[in-house]
Amino acid sequence: AVDLAAGRGSVQTLEGRNRAVGGSGLAALLFEAFGSVERPWDDPGQPLIFAIGPLTGYFPLMSKTVCAFKSPYHDQYAESHAGGRSALALRFADLDALVVTGRAPTPSCLAVGSHHIELQDVHYLWGQDVYATGRMLRRMYPGAGHRSILRIGPAGEIGSAMAGINVDTYRHFGRLGGGGVMGAKNLKGIVIEGDAAFSLPADKVIPAP
């Protein structure tokens, strides 16, 4: 979990993890732990959650990430799904989920990997669209093929209930205003760096047909 206001994060083990089914179940469990149904969607304490299921990286086509938050559209719990590299980047960062709380003091980019968390001031990107932002973040965070870059445009910056989160240029968390939630946290971008390795369990290898 990352606290943007404090500028620090930690790796935590979630009690009850095994009773949650898939990325959607994990995201809901994390919102129960970190979120509040009483507070408004743009309260800094409300979490922005990115979660994957147990088969990601182990079984073909399990490549979606679940983004969960309290929606600016109807002020209720919501989730949106996206493809791209985000799910595998989380897996290779040795994370089942990323939980972001708080509000950064300046427009910022959050970078996370298997051994690091970094929050960088990117005020100069505020106002840029997702394409210009993506080009700049790719230069700032090399490692094509191993990292996933999530970012918002001007609609997200103003908290629009229709703003999505762009993922690796061609994919989107497109439903229910996740981009507005990022903007409310002063978060212009998130870079997930899949910089670790994991091995398949020997007794779980799936033979080719």
Task: Please name every model-derived segment.
Residues 1-81, 85-209:
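Intrinsically disordered, low-complexity segments enriched in small residues
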